[in-house]
């Protein structure tokens, strides 16, 4: 299932690499607020640095961010032009944090975050070749330097999985193998779909319950009923995904199955066509297809 990832356009542009500096220039920019709150940013006079400069204004105590992680963060980004330094974008203006896979992110952002811990505030002065390079967003020059303030809320490795209590289970002939911390194995029956919506929590997490409007981090596999192979799997792609639930960004069946489920849970669900892709998703899914999903709820923000 192709879910919409929030605000990733500000991170997901390839660029050439360089070595990070000691962060003196980045630290000279004042970013004032508590962690997780929109900062007030004051730039020094003069031009931005020519190389990548990274600093840490707050130090977290969570997991260390690794190169293949999906990162969830609040951020504010400016064009650092040495004059007006205009705001580029901020997750605080969108009502939810951003999510982005480091392996597909701006080179400067990826390098800046690796090695820092969840709960840290990272600041980065990013030169053009480590930012958008020759493909900047509309209204921004190709030679623009950037400045990011990033509050790291979470980091999720490719093997992240449900962590609650429970294990293998069945739903209307579907079999799901695998326990907490393990990748699930999904097997569908060779029978007609049961009709109607069904869902079942196989592993029940101990976290807060998912609320409509939150950004939810997941691992999942989706199958067309009767198919031997998945049409999409974050496990196979080695990349957890995040989406905003309750705003029409995912299929209706996901919203029905996941809102109210505790974080850390694994849910298996059967979606009739009207709760899945009722218009189809050619060439993978026809409008008449019933779908089966197994979803691990890793976090909600």
Where in this protein do the model-derived segments appear?
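Cross-family detector of peptidyl-prolyl cis-trans isomerase
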Residues: 2-301
């Amino acid at each position: 299932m192709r879910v919409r990832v929030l605000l990733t356009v500000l991170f997901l542009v390839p660029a050439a690499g360089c070595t990070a500096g000691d962060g003196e220039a980045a630290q000279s920019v004042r970013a004032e607020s508590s962690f997780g709150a929109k900062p007030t940013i004051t730039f020094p006079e003069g031009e931005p640095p020519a190389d990548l400069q990274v600093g840490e204004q707050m130090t977290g105590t969570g997991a260390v961010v690794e190169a293949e992680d999906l990162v969830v963060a609040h951020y504010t980004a400016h064009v650092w032009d040495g004059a007006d330094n205009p705001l580029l974008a901020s997750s605080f203006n969108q009502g939810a944090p951003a999510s982005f896979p480091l392996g597909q992110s701006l080179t400067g952002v990826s390098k800046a975050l690796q090695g820092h811990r969840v709960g840290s505030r990272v600041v980065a002065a990013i030169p053009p070749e480590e930012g958008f390079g020759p493909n900047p967003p509309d209204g921004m020059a190709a030679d623009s330097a950037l400045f990011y303030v990033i509050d790291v809320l979470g980091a999720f490795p490719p093997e992240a999985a449900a962590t609650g209590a429970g294990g293998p289970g069945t739903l209307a002939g579907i079999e799901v193998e695998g326990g907490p911390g393990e990748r699930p194995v999904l097997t569908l029956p060779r029978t007609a779909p049961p009709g109607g919506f069904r869902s079942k929590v196989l592993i029940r997490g101990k976290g807060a319950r998912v609320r409509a409007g939150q950004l939810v981090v997941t691992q999942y596999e989706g199958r067309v009923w009767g198919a031997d192979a998945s049409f999409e799997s974050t496990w196979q792609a080695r990349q957890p995904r995040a989406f905003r639930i309750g705003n029409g960004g995912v299929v209706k069946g996901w919203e029905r199955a996941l809102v109210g489920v505790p974080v850390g849970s694994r849910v298996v669900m059967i979606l009739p066509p009207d709760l899945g892709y009722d218009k189809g998703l050619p060439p993978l899914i026809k409008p008449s297809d019933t779908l089966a999903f197994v979803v691990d709820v890793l976090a909600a923000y």
